[in-house]
């Protein structure tokens, strides 16, 4: 029993796993957040689902002609919407925010994507237009220090000519139910 051993608080936590692999001189990158107990708390589920929503909406923006800068600009609005739903931001504060210091950055302080290829964080200009056959990550996160946890999810995508990108990690579990099932099997 983890509580009787003084580990009750640890039992409520999550583990954020950011891993990569190399094959044929090319790199990969993936992040998942999993509950130590095998079950997410109700609050963790809400935050996890918000991060997954941001990832899924951002995926639709990873298309030919956009740039990483475009993705970062658009994800600010998507993230802000989710943070309002979670009660972390208030609409009245958003209306008065400094555009050079958006409020969502308190909870999501890194970029949404990076190039991937010969290196995990491969070299590439954020202004360069995205072209078919380029490979990028999408990695939103929400980090809530006051609540003692955060969630980040990351997959790798191949940009296509005339369609949405291909998630190269689509067979790796990411949905809440999938993660809990694996953790409890």
Describe the role of every protein-language-model region:
Residues 1-11:
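Single conserved hydrophobic/aromatic residue that forms the stacking wall/gate
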Residues 14-56, 112-185:
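Charged, cofactor-coupling segments
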Residues 88-95, 151-153:
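A glycine-biased, small/acidic residue-tolerant capping/turn segment at secondary-structure junctions
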């Amino acid at each position: 029993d983890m509580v009787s051993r003084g580990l009750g608080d640890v039992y409520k936590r999550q583990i954020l796993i950011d891993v990569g692999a190399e094959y044929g001189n090319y790199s990969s990158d993936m992040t998942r957040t999993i509950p130590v107990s095998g079950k997410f708390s109700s609050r963790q589920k809400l935050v996890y689902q918000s991060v997954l929503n941001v990832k899924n909406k951002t995926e639709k923006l990873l298309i030919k002609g956009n740039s990483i800068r475009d993705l970062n600009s658009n994800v600010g609005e998507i993230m802000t919407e989710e943070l309002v739903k979670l009660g972390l931001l208030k609409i009245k504060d958003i209306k008065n925010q400094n555009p050079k210091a958006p409020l969502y950055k308190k909870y999501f302080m890194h970029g949404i994507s990076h190039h991937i290829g010969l290196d995990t964080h491969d070299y590439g200009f954020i202004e360069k237009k995205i072209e078919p056959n380029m490979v990028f990550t999408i990695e939103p996160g929400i980090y809530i220090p006051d609540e003692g946890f955060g969630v980040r999810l990351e997959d790798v995508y191949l940009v296509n000519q005339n369609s949405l990108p291909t998630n190269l990690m689509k067979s790796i579990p990411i949905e809440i139910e999938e993660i809990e099932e694996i953790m409890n099997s």
